[in-house]
Amino acid sequence: MKIEFIQARDLPDAWFQCVYNIFDKGYEYTIDRGSFKGQKRIEYEYVVVQITHPGTRPLIPDIPPGCNVPPPTSMEYVEQYLEKLITSRKDVHETYTYGEDLEKQIDEVIRMYREEGLNTNQAYMAVGDASSILLEDPQCLRGIDTRIRYGKLHFMLYFRSWDLWAGFPSNLAGLQLLKEYMGKEIGVEDGEIIASSKGLHIYDYCWELAQTRTGRKK
């Protein structure tokens, strides 16, 4: 197994580096089970992404004029994703929302830090349960670990599977907004994001877009 380490200053930088490097470092295969069964994707075997200043604006990738590549996400979509992170409200067609698991845990983590002190390893927010494996499309984000160190709130994230092209920028922007909110409620500054996954991938229908955006396609 190859473990890739990527260090970036901000969220757009992290996205660009991951997209650029996956064509050299990724493993290409055909999906046997899961979303887009039968299609190909290229995937990091395991990746750790450290983002030192994730709050730097803009939070989402900026596509240069003339690149002829549609933006992978928008702040409007990020705000919709944030709502799914922090509230348990679920639409009829949805099998789950992250907020079902996170809503009460967010409040408890804030309370824990404010009332019991900053030096703890117990402020971890879990997503999913034993029944999640039976879902047709189980939750991709499986955990948000937190750490307050050097006066800042840091997030450590794990994704079991993660769409790099559009999911990565949307998810991290939404989680950054959540981290900023929690930091203000706790009374500390905003810190880093360290995200890891054994399934950060790009589907074959996005390969040409990704290669165009990163300058790999001439």
For the regions a language model picked out, list residue spans one by one.
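Terminal, non-catalytic protein-protein interaction segments that mediate quaternary/complex assembly
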Residues: 1-218
